[in-house]
Each structure stands twice: as C-alpha cells, then as structure tokens.
Curated annotation (Swiss-Prot):
Its main location: membrane. Its EC number is 7.2.2.6. The active site is at D304 (4-aspartylphosphate intermediate). GO terms for cellular component: membrane raft; plasma membrane. Mg(2+) binds at D511, D515. This is Potassium-transporting ATPase ATP-binding subunit 1. HAMAP family: KdpB (MF_00285). Keywords: ATP-binding, Cell membrane, Ion transport, Magnesium, Membrane, Metal-binding, Nucleotide-binding, Phosphoprotein, Potassium, Potassium transport, Translocase, Transmembrane, Transmembrane helix, Transport. InterPro entries: ATPase_P-typ_cyto_dom_N (IPR023299), ATPase_P-typ_P_site (IPR018303), ATPase_P-typ_TM_dom_sf (IPR023298), ATPase_P-typ_transduc_dom_A_sf (IPR008250), HAD-like_sf (IPR036412), HAD_sf (IPR023214), P-type_ATPase_bsu_IA (IPR006391), P_typ_ATPase (IPR001757). It comes from Staphylococcus aureus (strain N315). ATP binds at D341, E345, F370, T371, A372, E373, T374, R375, M376, S377, K388.
Length: 673
C-alpha cells in the first residue's frame, strides 16, 4: 500500500489500451453521454465510408470520411484510455492487498477448550481463535486474552510492529496481519468477505465510487453545452442550403465533435478516480469520492496538539519547588507519583529524578492512574498520598481539602507556560511542593505548512487539554490561528458545531472511542488505523499509518482535485470557443466571401480546417492525461489568486493553444494533399 505506482508503467499501459477498446461497447459508453455523442458520430462516419450515398448528398471523398472515422475512433480510445489507466492503478493496488489474503488455516478454540484447525474462510463472527508468533490473523477481531506485537506492514506499509492487548482502545486486530511475538486469543468480529481488508480492496478498486455532487453539477453544465452546440450544428445545414453551400454530413459530424466539450468529457472520470488514487498513495483510505472532494472545500482544521502539532512525548526538563518547600522533597514526591506511571512523561520524570543524585524512597503504594476527568495521577501509601497533575485540578483539590495555595505557585506555572512547556503541579497530603516542567517540541516544518494553509484561506484551530498560557505559547510558536485550551475529547464536538454554524467546512482527526461522535459530526473525519473500530466507522477517511499530521495533506489533495477539474474544464470550454472561431470562417468563406476577413489563420481549405481541428481535439486529450492523473500543481495562495492564475493559464491558454495547434496540423496536412 505504501508503494507508489508510476503513471505510465508498461504493464498498466498495456492493460489500459486493452480496456480502452473494450469500453467502446455502446452500453458502457452511454454512461458518458458526451462521449456517446462522439461514438454515434464515429458510427455514422463508418456508415458513410461504407455507403457514401447513405444520405444522398455526400460531397467529400470516401478517404476523407474514413479519416474522420479513424480520428473519432482514436478520440474515443484516448478518452477511454485515461479512465482505464486511472482504474488500472487502483486495481494494481488492490491486487497487492489481495496477496495478503492467501489461503490459511485458523486454530479455533472450541467450547471445551480444545483446538481444531479449520479454513479461515469458514470462520464466523463470534468464533475464537488462537494466533501465535509467526502466524497470520485470519480475520478481523477483538483481542480477548494475551498481549503481543503485531506486524501490520502488509496492510499499512508501516514496518514498526504495534502492541495489541485485551481491553482499552487498542484491542482490535486486522485480518491479514501477523503476530510478531507472543500470542493472542481473538474473537472474530466480521463475517467472511466483510473484513476490513475486503472493504479496503473494494474502496481501492473504486467499486463503490459514485459521482460527487460537484461532478454531477459539472456534468449537467457540460451536457447543456453539448446540447447547445449540437443545436448550432443542426442549424448550419439549412443555413448552408440557403447560401447554396454544399456542407457534407461528414463535415457536420466532425464539426460537432470539435465543438462539444469532449476534452473534459473524456477526462472527467479519470480526474475523480486519480484523486482517490492520490489519497491512496498517501496510505489513506477514502470511503467515497465525496469525502476526498469535501476536503477541497475545508476551511477550518481542528487539530490535536499532542501527536499532531507536537511530537507528543513531553519530557521532564526541570523540578521547580515553591518557596515553602525544598528541592529534595519535590524530587522525591515527583518520583513517587511517577514510579508506576508507564507514560513517556512519567518515565521521563523518573529518569530526571535519578539524575539529581538524591536518595529516592522505595515505599510501595497503590497507583492511581490519570483520567480525563481528574487530570492527575499518583500513589496512595498507608499514611500519605502524593499526586502530580494539571495546575487547575491540583489547586481545586487542595482548596476543597482546606489546604493552602503557595503565593508563588501562579508565577511558577505561568513561567513554565510562557516557555512553551507544560507545568505539572506536585502535592503531598494536599500540600503543594512545586512544579515539574515538561518540555513540548513542535514538529518540524509545521510553521511553514500553517502559513501555506492560511494563505489558502484555511483556518487552523488547536485543541489541547493544556491550560490557557501553555496553549497560547504553543499556538504562537507553531503558528496556528486559534486554540481551545483545557479541551476534553467530548468538547471537540461543540467546537465543530460552532464552526459549522458559521458556515465553515470542518475537518478533524481522532483515534479513540470518545472521538467517534466528533469524527461523525465533522465534514471530514480522519481516523487513525491504530484507533478503535468505532472511530474508524465514524470517520470517512482512515489513515493506515496512523499519522494525524496527514490531515493537512488530504486537504491539499482535495483542493488539488477541485482545481484540476476546474482548470481542465476552463481549458476545455476555452478550447471549444477558440475552435469555433478558428474553423467556421474557413468553412464558410467560399459561400460568404466576407468571412475571409475572419479567417486569420488562413487555413488551406474547409476540409483541412475541420480535419486539423479534429486531430487537435484527439491529441489534446492525450497531452492532458498526465495533468488529469497527477493534478494541477499549485503553491499556497488565496482562492482568488489561484482562480486568477488558473484563468490566465488555462483560460487564456485554452484560447491560444487551439489556434497554434490547428494551424500546425493544417500545414502538415498540406504536405500530403
């Protein structure tokens, strides 16, 4: 999954060429009415080639009509090729995933505790299996016993094994992954054919892909333009009769194909599929094309501080006692409150305490773990208790117990916060001893990324459980626009609703069960693959690498998808207008000499003018395939700036390029006439 696929790999091109011919079947082509019009024109040209008197008025040579047939055929093949190539890349990724679904046996645990070996395909929801070192997990499940490291690289591309154990947020395992060490007992949670891997394959292959609202709106516009141009073409026949100008049916067919928006009509499906593919190349699964497209409309990002903006492993940097306590007493209490704390922060406090060369206590007590509600952790001994935690929570505890708050505590807490650190207050028996300074490190490159997002009109909001000062310092250092301090997971849904009430499109990341409501509420929810099943079901995007920073990448991909579609649509419509004014003067100058003044290109003849435009129309589809597949490149700028730039490049370019291309092709045709 993590490996990217080159656009024009030989095996993909060969398969795409075969598929592009198979897609000529009319039942398939009618799904794209614009290209179906081209196919009808191609069949009429073929009929006129075989039976020149089909309409009792054909005035051009059979070779000329056959040339039109061949060019129209190539136009259809090129349009189908772009779609087939985009689909082929998805199928290649799906085949890579399918390789992990090799036939395997499963060790099912029967009710009497004995084992039986059965085919993994025979496993049902609720069955319990035992998986040991080196064995593959046969299907999606939930760990009910044991602790093991699991290698998920076959699914996620991430080489580092992850720890799975019963209980908590990390007890879900994916079928197709393998146990790297120890053993697990797993309760199967999905029926055969409905596993996470099966869903991934379906998503990657695009089997469930439907047109997005923007695609439907654009398609409606293109169909309207097609009908308008067809009506214009139909009126030309009686007009030519009135002017005593013999306008052949073959030329009318060619002119119709030149003027309707075949360029974007042939590339529209490929653009959407390629957009999904670019997301997949980042190891992100999109549940629908709509979710990727919505990313392009996002203007507010809700970001967690820990793990997204900072590296997440805050390290103890200093012990700062209050005036009424001593340094040694603070170190001992901090050590005792952290000795059983297995978090990175807890381990760093113990490590820093050892460096102080103080005789540390060895008394054993009952560990009180940190919770989102209490926001503190510590140890209860027989005659006393020590805690460390968020300043507000600790002060509240002391006040409720009738204790004394040191006068210099507030200054110490603010001092740590102003440095961008996180202060933890330490107390013993409701007596505050001092502050632990936890250092937070901003991830590299985020300042520039946030600046780029700001220039594009995207606002970043940092949500953190830290106090106001710490949050403000980190927000300023990272360059986020706003922050929400002392924010609990359940508070995020309120932040999202507030932004949506302002008319904003909101995106957020999450991995826990408590994030699921907010992920479902957000317009774009990116769940971590390492997270809970409820979070992954609530989100519309899943990051297989479990890297929350990727939310920013997905938003940029979504914007690129919309820009690519808009840019190529602008280019296509500008092309049609340019071809209209390039061809018509050359066609009618014999019947209407005044039209010769408009024939600024001085094309050789009406026949060569139409043929040149038709060839250009086919070639431009091929030339635009790389842009449709890779997307339009852009740098951070406001929407208005990007729009003006694209109008200049693709609008003006779309007007100029046809004049140049058609003239060059006309000159080449003259060499063979």
């Amino acid at each position: 999954m993590a490996e990217t696929t080159k656009i024009f790999e030989s095996h993909l091109v060969k398969q795409a060429l075969k598929d592009s011919v198979l897609k000529l079947y009319p039942v398939y082509m009618i799904k794209n009415p614009i290209m179906f019009v081209v196919e009808v024109g191609m069949l009429l040209a073929l009929g006129l080639t075989i039976y020149p008197d089909l309409f009792h008025q054909e005035s051009v040579s059979r070779l000329y009509v056959f040339s039109i047939f061949i060019i129209l055929l190539l136009t259809l093949v090129f349009a189908n090729f772009s779609e087939a190539l985009a689909e082929g890349r998805g199928k290649a990724q799906a085949n890579a995933l399918r390789q992990t679904q090799t036939e395997m046996k499963a060790r099912r645990i029967k009710q009497d505790g004995s084992y039986e070996m059965i085919d993994a395909s025979d496993l049902k929801k609720g069955h319990i299996v035992r998986v040991a070192t080196g064995e593959q997990i046969p299907n999606d499940g939930k760990v009910i016993k044991g602790l093991a490291t699991v290698d998920e690289s076959a699914i996620t591309g991430e080489s580092a094994p992850v720890i799975k154990e019963s209980g908590g947020d990390f007890d879900n395992v994916i079928g197709g992954t393998s146990v790297a060490s120890d053993w697990l007992e797993v309760e199967i949670t999905s029926e055969p054919g409905h596993s996470f891997l099966d869903k991934m394959i379906g998503l990657v292959e695009g089997a469930t892909r439907k047109k997005t609202p923007n695609e439907i709106a654009l398609f409606t516009l293109l169909m309207t333009l097609t009908i308008i141009f067809l009506v214009v073409i139909l009126t030309m026949y009686p007009l030519a009769k009135f002017l005593n100008f013999n306008l052949s049916i073959a030329m009318l067919i060619a002119l119709a194909v030149c003027l309707i928006p075949t360029t974007i009509g042939g590339l529209l499906s490929a653009i959407g599929i390629a957009g999904m593919d670019r997301v997949t190349q980042f190891n992100i699964l999109a549940k629908s094309g709509r979710s990727v497209e919505t990313c392009g409309d996002v203007n507010v990002l809700i970001l967690d501080k820990t793990g997204t903006i900072t590296y997440g492993n805050r390290m103890a940097d200093a012990f700062i006692p209050v005036k009424s306590s001593s340094f040694e007493r603070l170190v001992k209490a901090a050590y005792e409150s952290s000795i059983a704390d297995d978090t990175p922060e807890g381990r760093s406090i113990v490590k820093l305490a050892y460096k102080q060369h103080i005789d540390l206590p060895q008394e054993v007590g009952e560990y009180i773990p940190f919770t989102a509600e209490t926001r503190m952790s510590g140890v209860k001994f027989t005659t006393r208790e020590v805690y460390k935690g968020a300043p507000n929570s600790m002060v509240k505890r002391v006040k409720e117990a009738g204790g004394h708050i040191p006068v210099d505590l507030d200054a110490l807490v603010k001092g740590v916060s102003k440095k961008g650190g996180t202060p933890l207050v330490v107390l013993e028996d409701n007596e505050i001893l001092g502050v632990i300074y936890l250092k937070d490190v901003i991830k590299d490159g985020l300042v520039e990324r946030f600046r780029e997002l700001r220039e594009m009109g995207i606002e970043t909001v940092m949500c953190t459980g830290d106090n106001e000062l710490t949050a403000a310092t980190i927000a300023k250092e990272a360059g986020v626009d706003r922050f929400v301090a002392e924010c609990k997971p359940e508070d995020k849904i309120n932040v999202i609703r507030e932004e949506q009430a302002k008319g904003h499109i909101v995106a957020m990341t999450g991995d826990g069960t408590n994030d699921a409501p907010a992920l479902a509420e957000a317009n774009v929810g990116l769940a971590m693959n390492s997270g809970t099943m409820s979070a992954k079901e609530a989100a519309n995007l899943i990051d297989l690498d479990s890297n929350p920073t990727k939310l920013m990448e997905v938003v940029l991909i979504g914007k690129q998808l919309l820009m690519t579609r808009g840019s190529l649509t602008t280019f296509s419509i500008a092309n049609d207008i340019a071809k209209y004014f390039a061809i018509l003067p050359a066609m009618f100058m014999a019947a209407m000499p005044a039209m010769n003044h408009l024939n600024i290109m001085h094309l050789h003849s009406p026949e060569s003018a139409v043929l040149s435009a038709l060839i250009f129309n086919a070639l431009i589809i091929v030339l635009l395939i790389p842009i449709a597949m890779k997307g339009v490149k852009f740098k951070g700028a406001s929407t208005q700036t990007i729009l003006m730039k694209n109008m200049l490049v693709y609008g003006l370019g779309g007007m100029i390029v046809p004049f140049i291309g058609i003239k060059l092709i006309d000159l080449i045709i003259q060499l063979f006439v």
